[in-house]
């Protein structure tokens, strides 16, 4: 897969620590970052330092880190981590996951392999456990003075023993870190305990203050809590069926090869989000205010006094 500033690969490995850390045996996750391509606030060197410093059952583990120099002008950082088999996105997009009181569907086929791995018997137990473990991961980071700043379903994985793992500290912020605002100038009344770069987070999971780039910074820890809430809300939003052709060949292929047998496509779904970010930040802000209402005073939303 590819992120904004990185590429992620599935790599073979003989490291025994992979299994110990709940990863798929014989494989590792290899994240590669070209240090000259990354842009603020992405910082692979800080990410490595944070992964080396932190240790929690619900956070990913850094098994190794090294650099490559394919040419005199390029330095690529390589982060080796366990390859976890399930992404929360896969769970949320499953048609077998419905907010009902009856037991979850039997894990009898590949589509429901996540059920077999996670071992939950009711919808309530799945939601409760995910919430508890994600809260524990975030609480640990915040206790260490670290804000994640990109909490979303695709950054939440599950190990082979069903343990939730929060990954990707690429845009994380620390209380000891003095972040340079996009303007290049620190506000005279801004403190070092604020984060300033608002271009963090992803889509519908971004806190509303990030959409308006407050001049005096924002509370990155509160932004994490907002993201936590929007992620957990996804367990209760609508499951939408993808609009795809019912057959696996386009019309022009059917014209050229009329004798080719037609095979129906499997049904696929995706989980809607609490707020709609499909049309950009303005639409997202409007949707947030439509659901939550507008704040009635600056004390309810201090950053609002310095929106740009």
Which residues are covered by each model-predicted region?
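Glycine-rich ATP phosphate-binding loop
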Residues: 7-34
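Conserved N-lobe beta3->alphaC-helix segment of eukaryotic protein kinase catalytic domains
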Residues: 32-54
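Catalytic-loop of the protein kinase fold
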Residues: 142-159
């Amino acid at each position: 897969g590819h992120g904004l500033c990185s590429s992620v690969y599935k790599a073979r490995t003989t490291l025994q620590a992979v299994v110990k850390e709940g990863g798929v045996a014989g494989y590792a996750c290899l994240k590669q970052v070209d240090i000259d391509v990354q842009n603020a606030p992405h910082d692979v060197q800080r990410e490595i330092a944070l992964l080396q410093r932190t240790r929690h059952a619900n956070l990913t583990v850094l098994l190794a880190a090294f650099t490559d120099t394919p040419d005199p002008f390029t330095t690529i950082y390589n982060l080796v981590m366990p390859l976890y088999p399930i992404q929360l996105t896969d769970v949320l997009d499953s048609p077998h996951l419905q907010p009902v009181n009856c037991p979850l569907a039997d894990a009898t086929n590949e589509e429901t392999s996540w059920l077999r791995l996670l071992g939950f018997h009711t919808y309530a137990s799945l939601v409760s456990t995910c919430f508890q473990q994600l809260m524990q991961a975030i609480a640990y980071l915040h206790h260490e003075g670290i804000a994640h700043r990109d909490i979303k379903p695709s950054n939440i994985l599950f190990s082979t023993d069903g343990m939730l793992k929060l990954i990707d500290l690429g845009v994380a912020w620390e209380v000891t870190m003095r972040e340079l605002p996009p303007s290049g100038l620190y506000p005279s009344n801004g403190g070092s305990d604020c984060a300033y770069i608002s271009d963090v987070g992803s889509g519908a999971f971004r806190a509303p203050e990030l959409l308006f780039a407050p001049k005096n910074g924002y509370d990155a820890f509160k932004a994490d809590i907002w993201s936590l809430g929007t992620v957990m809300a996804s367990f209760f939003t609508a499951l939408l069926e993808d609009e795809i052709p019912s057959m696996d060949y386009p019309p022009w292929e059917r014209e050229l090869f009329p004798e080719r047998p037609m095979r129906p496509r499997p049904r696929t779904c995706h989980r809607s989000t609490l707020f709609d970010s499909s049309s950009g930040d303005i639409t997202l802000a409007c949707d947030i205010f439509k659901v939550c209402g507008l704040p009635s005073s600056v004390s309810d939303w201090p950053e609002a006094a310095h929106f740009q």
